[in-house]
Amino acid sequence: ATGWSMGAIQAFHWAASYPDRVERLAPFAGTAKTWPHNIVLIEGIRAALQADVAWNNGQYTAPPEVGLRTLGRVYASWGFSQPFYREECYKALGYETLSEFISGFWEESFVPSDANDLLAMMWTWQHADISQNDRYKGDFETALRSIQARTVVMPVRTDLYFTPEDSEYETKHIPNATFKPIESIWGHLAGFGLNPVDTAFINNTLKELLGTN
């Protein structure tokens, strides 16, 4: 099981829920539950979207575009790291200025989305926890210890919300796990396939994991 971001949360969920069936686990830029600082991010982007009067408590007749664009601008400070912006890495994505990047990349990423779909995703993300079920009854460390898969946990060193510190804590409680950070300044989006160097690191790690006995 593998996945990025919320896909990583899902991968952890499969490995904990079906420990006898998942033989390899490789979550990247994601954790086994949503930790408090991550929840702070979600509360902020939710508020940005819902502040648009056009959202109308979810009963909108047209997309709340102002709220969607504002959400994108708020997210811009979280998705990539400080050194990403300092070193102007956005130019590698075809944007000449910071302003162009914020509007062209971040705003336009969210404008096509349905607002209520995004809010449903945020709720799922905020409440993610592999131990919140009848099997583990909230015992998070027991849920982690139950994972039998050969595991490689790949946080991004500069991820601002699925932090490497949270991932390292989780890795220590998984019996057969290796902590292997993605050493990148592309923040959370190092796992999104935008930077070839980061993508190659992930691909090579997956190949190594699948090749082990």
Model-derived segments and their meaning:
Residues 21-108:
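Alpha/beta-hydrolase-fold enzymes
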Residues 104, 120-143:
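Active-site nucleophile elbow and catalytic-triad environment of alpha/beta-hydrolase enzymes
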Residues 8-19, 25:
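Short glycine-enriched nucleophile-adjacent loop
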Residues 1-3, 28:
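Short beta-strand immediately N-terminal to the catalytic nucleophile in serine-hydrolase-like folds
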Residues 147, 153-155:
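Short beta-strand/loop motif that positions the catalytic acidic residue
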Residues 168-172, 176-213:
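Catalytic active-site module of serine/aspartate enzymes centered on a nucleophile-bearing elbow/loop
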Residues 136, 160-166:
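Conserved alpha/beta-hydrolase "acid-adjacent" motif
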